[in-house]
């Protein structure tokens, strides 16, 4: 009876020879503690992709269990930070040192933040989809952070058309009157007869991806989310009372946006942030008027960097 279990990956050569760019696993479910700048560490439930290259064309395969166990060790013994991510990628390569010299990992998770309402200051949770990606190649670490931030966009064209209809309704209602009593006007403006039209608006999402500088240790997740919401002015809310809804309506009216406007606001904001070497962004306006979406994509324009 054999006493040693066979190791096909080590003991067998590839049937068809060829180097492979990436081999590994996806959809690994892992709980993690994430170190984000400016806030305490917090737990997340992540789905992970873990890969190494296979540079030896004759090698049958990689040792996936080694990658899995290294990831599990980080999950149970440490936190996800710049240093631990770099060490994890180094360990991936070291565990395959004869057949691999590149490593890749990606963490996808929802990052929950407490958000105050606009006026009442009630609080609620908002979940932001986040991805952290690391690649180690030729001794260099490349880190990337991406977030999705929902917001409201109100169409400038639709707002102008609605205002025109209100003007027409006013002219019809008070035709022939040289003067109109202020109290009557006030009451009329507060009625559906007075406000005969409203502009269309829709939930929208900003997808933002940034290349992190080498000096980053704790990930600037909250900083990036705050910057996006601050530039757009109309983030989707959590807890909402009537006074908050009214303020949200005011903010939408004062921040009318085509997708081009939203994209340029974010472009301007991200250009001011020195801890991001590069960025790529896409704004998606999920139109309530049209059956299609309105989309704008732009980048920082770094030579050799992200492309649209």
UniProtKB/Swiss-Prot annotation:
Pfam families: GCHY-1 (PF02649). The keyword Magnesium does not apply. Its EC number is 3.5.4.16. InterPro entries: GTP_cyclohydrolase_FolE2, GTP_cyclohydrolase_FolE2/MptA. Keywords: Hydrolase. Pathway: Cofactor biosynthesis; 7,8-dihydroneopterin triphosphate biosynthesis; 7,8-dihydroneopterin triphosphate from GTP: step 1/1. It catalyses: GTP + H2O = 7,8-dihydroneopterin 3'-triphosphate + formate + H(+). It comes from the Bacteria. It is an enzyme of class 3 (hydrolase). The record marks 155 as: May be catalytically important. One of its GO terms (biological process) is tetrahydrofolate biosynthetic process. One of its GO terms (molecular function) is GTP cyclohydrolase I activity. Belongs to the GTP cyclohydrolase IV family. Converts GTP to 7,8-dihydroneopterin triphosphate. This is GTP cyclohydrolase FolE2. It comes from Idiomarina loihiensis (strain ATCC BAA-735 / DSM 15497 / L2-TR). The lineage of its organism: Bacteria, Pseudomonadati, Pseudomonadota, Gammaproteobacteria, Alteromonadales.
């Amino acid at each position: 009876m054999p006493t040693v279990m066979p190791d096909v990956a080590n003991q067998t050569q590839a049937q068809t020879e060829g180097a492979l760019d990436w081999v590994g696993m996806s959809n690994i479910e892992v709980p993690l503690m994430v170190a984000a700048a400016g806030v305490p560490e917090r737990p997340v439930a992540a789905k992970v992709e873990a890969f190494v290259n296979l540079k030896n064309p004759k090698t049958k395969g990689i040792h996936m269990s080694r990658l899995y166990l290294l990831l599990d060790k980080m999950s149970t013994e440490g936190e996800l930070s710049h240093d631990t991510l770099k060490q994890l990628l180094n360990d991936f390569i070291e565990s395959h040192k004869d057949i691999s010299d590149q490593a890749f990992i990606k963490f996808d998770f929802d990052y929950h933040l407490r958000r105050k309402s606009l006026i009442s200051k009630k609080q609620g949770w908002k979940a932001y989809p986040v991805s952290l990606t690391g690649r180690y190649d030729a001794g260099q670490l490349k880190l990337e952070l991406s977030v999705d931030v929902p917001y409201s966009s109100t169409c400038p064209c639709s707002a102008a058309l609605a205002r025109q209809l209100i003007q027409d309704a006013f002219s019809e209602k008070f035709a022939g009157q040289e003067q109109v009593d202020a109290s009557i006007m006030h009451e009329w403006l507060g009625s559906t007869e007075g406000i005969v039209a409203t502009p269309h608006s829709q939930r929208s999402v900003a997808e933002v991806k940034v290349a992190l500088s080498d000096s980053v240790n704790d990930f600037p997740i909250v900083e990036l989310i705050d910057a996006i919401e601050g530039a757009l002015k109309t983030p989707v809310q959590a807890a909402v009372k009537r006074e908050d809804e009214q303020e949200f309506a005011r903010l939408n009216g004062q921040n009318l946006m085509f997708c081009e406007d939203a994209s340029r606001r974010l472009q301007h904001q991200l250009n001011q942030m020195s801890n991001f070497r590069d960025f790529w962004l896409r704004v998606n306006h999920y139109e309530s008027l049209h059956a299609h979406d309105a989309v704008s994509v732009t980048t920082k324009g770094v030579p050799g960097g992200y492309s649209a």
